[in-house]
C-alpha cells in the first residue's frame, strides 16, 4: 500500500531514528535546521523536540545521516477509525518517541497489547497512543502487510501461570516470547497481577523459565461449595498456593491449610478454586490425591520370631498388625467403657501394664497404678477386613494373644507344674532372670502345650486399656524355655505384688550398662530440658545395638536442641522441615519435643510474616518507582518550562533594548522637531521685521 509522496526541507518537522543500542526501532520528533544537499552522505543538523542535552537545559542537537531522517507520517494513520488488527505493525507513543511493535491482542476499554522485539517485551497501550506503522522509502510511504499471528497455545500475549519451586506458588504471568536456550524450549514471561493486566507497567521484569514451569490458566471454577479435606488452591500474595480444606465456616469461608507451610488461614470462597493438574496438554482433576491422614494410634511392632509348636501359631508382628487393623477399622464392639488407645510413644513412659495369667482365668490386662485397678477381661477378636497398602486382605482369625508372647491361655483349665508352689526367694530369682531376658527374641521354638492352643472358642473383651505396645502389656519374656514356662504365672503375680509395694516401674528394651547414663544427667542441657524416653521402638533392633542406638538418640536430641536455639530468621524452610522431621522421629521414642517444636513453628510463623512484609515492601518499591518515573516527567516539564522562560526572558531583554533604542530615537527626533520649530519661528520673525521696516 503506497501513500502520497512527501519532501523534507529546512525548518520542517521530521522524525529521526538511530542504530544506537536500546534505541533500535524508535523514531523521535525533531526540527530540520538545514536543507538536504545533493549528497546523501552529508549529515544534517537536527534539533530534537522531546530529547534534551546532557545538562537538560536545552533541546538536544545532533548531526544525523540522511538515511535516518524521514518526514512525519500522515495523521490519517493515527485516527481512531483505523482498525488495529492482531498482527498489525504499529508505532507506540512510548518514552518520548514512537516505538515499532506488533499488536498481539485487543483488550477491554479499547486497549491493546503490543509486542516489542528489542528487548522482548509486551506493554499495554490505549488506542490514542498507537498509530499504524509506515515505511518511508524512495520518497513514498508504504504500509507493510499484516503479519500472520501465532495461534499456538503459548503465543505472545497469552495469559499463563508460572510455578515458583521456592515458594510453591503458581503466579499469573504473560507469555512474551517462546525461545530456545541450549536446545531447550523456554519462555520469556512477564509477571502480571491477578486480574490479568499489566497496566502498561513497563517496569515489570521479564523472566526466562523452563517450559515445564508454565501452564495455561485453569478453566473457570463452577464449584458452589468445597468439601472437607478437599484439595484446593487459594490465592495469596502473588499467586495460587495448594492447600486443603480443614474446616467449613459460615458466610462462604473456609479454614485452609497450606501444603507448603502447614499454616492455616481463613479464606473466602471467591479466593479458592479446585486443585487441578496440567499434564500432557490436558487438565486433570486431582483424583489421585490422598487426604491428609491423622496420625493413627501407634502399636509397637516386633520382629517375627520362630513359631511355637502349637496349631496355627502366629508371630507377634502379624498379631500386632491384625489387632491394629481391627482397632483402626472401628469395628470393636462398644461397651459402657470404651477401649481407648492413645499413642504408645507418648504414654509408655508414663504408664505400665502388668498381665497376670493363671490356669483358671483369661488373659488379664490392668492399667499400672499404685493399687491394682479393676481387672478387665479380654477375649479374642475375630479379624475383620483391613486394608493394607490400598488392598483388602482376606478375613483371618488371629490366634490368641498368648502366642505373641509364648504363653498359654485357654478357656479350659490347665494345671501348672509343681514349681508353682516354690518359695518366695526362688520366685524372685526366677523373676529377675525373666526380666533380664524380657523382650529378647531368639530363633528357638517355644514348647507350648497343645492344650493351651485351642483358642477358637476364646473371646477377648477390652473395656478400658491404656494404649501400650503388646510387649509392655505383658511384662514377661518374649520367648520362654520349657523350664521357664511353668513359672510364668507365679512370676507375673509376683510382679504385681512387687508393683503394689514399689509403684510403677519403667520398662526399657535394654539394660543401662554404659557410663554415659551416669554422666549425661550432669550436663547443662539435660538439667535445662530433662528427658525420660522409653525407647520402645528399639525392640525391633538387635539387643546388642539397642543401648548404643539410645545413646545416639540422646546425643542427637540435645544436639538438635542446640541447633534450634541458634536458629536465625533467615534459615531455609528445608532446614526447619528437617529439624521438625528429626524431632518427630525422636518423639516416637518418648522424647518430649513440645518446646523445640513450638520454637520451630514460631520461626516458620515469623518467616511467613516477614515474607508478607517483604512483599509489601516490594509493592511499595514498585509504587515508588512509578512515582519516580512520574516525577521525572514533571522534572522534564519543568526543564522545558524553564527553557521557555529563559527564551521569553531573552526575548524580553531584546524587546527592552529595542524599546529603549526606540525611546532614544523618539527623544532625538523630538529634539530635532523643537529645533526646527525654533528655526521656523525665527524665519517668521525675520519676515515680519523685513515687512515692517521703513522704506
From Swiss-Prot:
Residues 384-402 have a biased composition (Basic and acidic residues). Residues 434-459 have a biased composition (Polar residues). May be involved in the polar growth of plant cells via transportation of RNAs. Pfam families: Agenet, DUF724. The gene is DUF3. Residues 614-684 form a coiled coil. Disruption phenotype: No visible phenotype under normal growth conditions. Homodimer. Residues 509-694 form the DUF724 domain. This is DUF724 domain-containing protein 3. Disulfide bonds: none annotated. One of its GO terms (molecular function) is protein homodimerization activity. It comes from Arabidopsis thaliana (Mouse-ear cress). Residues 376-464 are annotated as: Disordered. It comes from the Eukaryota. GO terms for cellular component: plant-type vacuole. Keywords: Coiled coil, Growth regulation, Transport. The keyword Membrane does not apply. InterPro entries: Agenet-like_dom, Agenet_dom_plant, DUF724. CDD domains: Tudor_Agenet_AtDUF_rpt1_3 (cd20405), Tudor_Agenet_AtDUF_rpt2_4 (cd20406).
Amino acid at each position: 500500500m503506497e501513500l502520497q509522496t512527501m519532501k523534507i526541507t529546512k525548518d520542517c518537522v521530521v522524525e529521526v531514528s538511530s542504530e544506537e543500542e536500546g534505541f533500535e526501532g524508535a523514531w523521535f520528533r525533531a526540527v530540520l535546521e538545514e536543507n538536504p544537499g545533493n549528497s546523501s552522505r552529508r549529515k544534517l543538523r537536527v534539533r530534537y523536540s522531546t530529547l534534551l542535552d546532557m545538562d537538560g537545559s536545552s533541546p538536544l542537537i545532533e548531526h544525523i545521516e540522511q538515511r535516518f531522517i524521514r518526514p512525519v507520517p500522515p495523521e490519517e494513520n493515527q485516527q481512531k477509525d483505523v482498525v488495529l488488527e492482531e498482527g498489525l505493525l504499529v508505532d507506540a507513543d512510548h518514552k518520548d518517541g514512537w516505538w515499532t511493535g506488533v499488536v498481539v491482542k485487543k483488550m477491554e476499554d479499547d486497549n491493546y497489547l503490543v509486542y516489542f522485539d528489542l528487548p522482548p517485551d509486551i506493554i499495554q497501550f490505549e488506542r490514542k497512543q498507537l498509530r499504524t506503522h509506515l515505511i518511508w522509502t524512495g520518497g513514498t510511504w508504504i504500509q507493510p502487510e499484516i503479519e500472520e499471528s501465532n495461534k499456538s497455545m503459548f503465543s505472545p500475549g497469552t495469559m499463563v501461570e508460572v510455578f515458583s519451586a521456592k515458594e510453591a506458588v503458581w503466579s499469573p504471568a504473560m507469555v512474551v516470547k517462546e525461545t530456545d536456550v541450549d536446545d531447550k524450549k523456554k519462555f520469556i514471561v512477564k509477571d502480571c497481577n491477578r486480574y490479568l493486566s499489566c497496566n502498561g507497567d513497563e517496569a515489570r521484569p521479564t523472566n526466562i523459565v523452563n517450559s515445564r514451569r508454565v501452564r495455561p490458566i485453569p478453566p473457570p471454577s463452577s464449584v458452589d461449595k468445597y468439601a472437607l479435606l478437599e484439595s484446593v488452591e487459594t490465592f495469596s500474595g502473588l499467586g495460587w498456593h495448594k492447600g486443603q480444606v480443614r474446616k467449613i465456616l459460615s458466610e462462604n469461608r473456609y479454614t485452609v491449610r497450606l501444603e507448603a507451610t502447614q499454616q492455616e488461614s481463613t479464606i473466602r470462597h471467591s479466593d479458592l478454586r479446585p486443585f487441578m493438574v496440567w499434564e500432557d496438554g490436558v487438565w486433570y482433576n486431582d483424583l489421585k490425591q490422598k487426604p491428609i491422614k491423622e496420625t493413627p494410634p501407634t502399636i509397637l511392632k516386633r520382629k517375627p520370631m520362630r513359631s511355637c509348636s502349637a496349631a496355627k501359631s502366629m508371630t507377634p508382628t502379624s498379631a500386632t498388625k491384625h489387632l491394629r487393623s481391627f482397632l483402626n477399622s472401628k469395628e470393636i464392639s462398644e461397651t459402657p467403657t470404651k477401649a481407648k488407645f492413645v499413642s504408645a510413644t507418648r504414654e509408655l513412659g508414663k504408664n505400665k501394664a502388668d498381665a497376670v495369667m493363671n490356669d483358671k482365668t483369661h488373659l488379664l490386662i490392668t492399667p499400672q497404678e499404685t493399687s491394682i485397678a479393676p481387672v478387665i477381661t479380654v477375649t479374642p477378636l475375630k479379624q475383620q477386613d483391613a486394608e493394607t497398602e490400598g488392598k483388602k486382605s482376606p478375613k483371618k482369625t488371629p490366634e490368641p494373644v498368648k502366642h505373641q508372647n509364648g504363653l498359654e491361655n485357654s478357656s479350659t483349665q490347665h494345671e501348672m507344674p509343681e514349681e508353682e508352689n516354690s518359695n518366695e526367694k526362688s520366685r524372685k530369682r526366677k523373676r529377675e532372670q525373666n526380666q533380664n531376658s524380657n523382650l529378647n527374641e531368639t530363633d528357638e521354638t517355644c514348647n507350648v502345650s497343645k492344650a493351651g492352643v485351642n483358642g477358637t472358642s476364646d473371646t477377648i473383651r477390652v473395656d478400658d486399656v491404656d494404649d501400650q505396645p503388646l510387649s509392655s502389656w505383658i511384662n514377661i519374656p518374649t520367648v520362654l524355655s520349657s523350664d521357664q514356662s511353668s513359672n510364668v504365672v507365679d512370676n507375673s503375680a509376683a510382679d504385681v505384688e512387687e508393683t503394689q509395694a514399689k509403684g510403677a516401674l519403667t520398662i526399657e528394651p535394654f539394660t543401662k550398662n554404659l557410663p554415659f547414663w551416669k554422666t549425661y544427667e550432669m550436663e547443662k542441657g539435660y538439667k535445662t530440658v530433662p528427658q525420660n524416653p522409653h525407647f520402645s521402638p528399639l525392640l525391633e533392633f538387635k539387643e546388642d545395638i539397642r543401648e548404643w542406638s539410645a545413646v545416639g538418640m540422646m546425643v542427637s536430641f540435645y544436639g538438635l536442641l542446640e541447633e534450634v536455639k541458634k536458629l536465625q530468621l533467615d534459615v531455609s524452610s528445608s532446614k526447619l522441615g528437617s529439624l521438625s522431621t528429626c524431632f518427630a522421629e525422636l518423639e516416637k521414642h518418648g522424647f518430649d519435643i513440645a518446646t523445640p517444636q513450638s520454637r520451630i513453628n514460631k520461626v516458620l510463623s515469623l518467616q511467613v510474616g516477614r515474607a508478607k512484609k517483604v512483599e509489601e515492601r516490594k509493592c511499595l518499591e514498585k509504587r515508588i518507582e512509578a512515582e519516580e518515573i512520574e516525577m521525572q516527567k514533571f522534572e522534564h516539564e519543568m526543564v522545558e518550562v524553564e527553557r521557555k522562560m529563559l527564551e521569553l526572558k531573552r526575548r524580553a531583554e531584546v524587546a527592552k533594548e529595542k524599546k529603549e533604542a526606540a525611546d532614544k530615537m523618539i527623544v532625538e527626533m523630538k529634539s530635532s522637531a523643537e529645533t526646527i520649530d525654533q528655526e521656523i519661528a525665527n524665519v517668521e520673525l525675520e519676515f515680519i521685521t523685513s515687512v515692517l521696516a521703513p522704506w
